[in-house]
């Protein structure tokens, strides 16, 4: 499976790789506020959706046969109290593969891509109890599943040398297609949980501006479209790196502007929180809250009329688990509600604790946070934290060696 990489895609993918993967942990680590999902292996999980009965669906990859083994698709359904409802490990895929991009269909069937990161992406269908519901939908090896909703799949690929997006139903029937990666004639992503596609990203290949638009149902027509003016002097390229639906029907988005004439390295990235209404009109922006504390945005999350922003310090030790991380809370109307400082103690994770002390002189070991996702649950907000220990030989630019990995869920204090 090959996709033509462009300047726009590189920029927006790099932004997510660097920023979505940092940020945050949570409150006290007593038993009722923390649950360990995996220890030791380099497993990972992503939050996909909440089922109608309050259970949550997680998908990802599980490593088999130690650190040198392959990943296999891993699906976990957790009850509202975070006990396991059911779990599936699919060993039928050849080579390393993962599960991802899931949706609950109108008849209650759960559709999941169980071939992610391979050249044979397959949609499998399950009942709410994890049993097979119907035959698989095998996709073209030249496509990538970008999004899954109850009524369609959004796929991207290269056709005649051009990047394009196609929407299909769960029988494999094409609904419509257009040029561009998710965003028509641009590069971007889709807002999760929208029946009518709302897509956002960048026009990096043309004027470099950030854009968000809503498509009309299953037709390739725009209901509305908003192109953002550059907010800073000397901005070269702008992108909406993430957008989520808010409780008032609008959207909260992370805008990144890259200014290539500032900063020690010749450029500077500036992050801005933007709130759109349901018609795509800008209601407010906020960059000062992050600028004053030398922070970038790591992820945006909407929950019960509030917007939570996972913040990343611009300092070099932003990954270090020993330093507190920050979540800033805003109301949908733009009022800053306060901050939550989060810290997870590596000494309280038994599998990680044994790796904290270096075995050889001249090496250092650092407990680190790799990724955090906020998940809405019946008893509040929880964080799914991926963390571990890295060993470095102490030389400048030396390679780090992975030593331990934990997947933990932790309760988050709200503001």
Feature-to-residue mapping (PLM):
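Recurrent small/Gly-Pro-centered beta-turn motifs in extracellular repeat architectures
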Residues: 58-62, 112-116, 155-158, 199-204, ...
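A short loop-to-beta-strand structural motif that recurs across blades of beta-propeller domains
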Residues: 72-76, 121-124, 163-166, 209-213, ...
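Blade-level signature of beta-propeller repeat domains, shared across WD40, Kelch, NHL, RCC1
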Residues: 372-415
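Aromatic (tryptophan-biased) beta-strands that constitute blades/sheets of beta-rich domains
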Residues: 32-44, 74, 83-92, 132-138, ...
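Repeated scaffold domains used in trafficking and secretory/extracellular systems
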Residues: 42-49, 95-104, 138-148, 181-192, ...
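Short, solvent-exposed loop/turn segments at conserved positions within beta-propeller repeat blades
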Residues: 66-71, 116-120, 158-162, 204-209, ...
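An edge-strand/N-cap motif at the start of beta-rich repeat modules
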Residues: 30-62
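Short coil/turn segments that connect the beta-strands within blades of beta-propeller domains
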Residues: 53-54, 107-108, 150-151, 194-197, ...
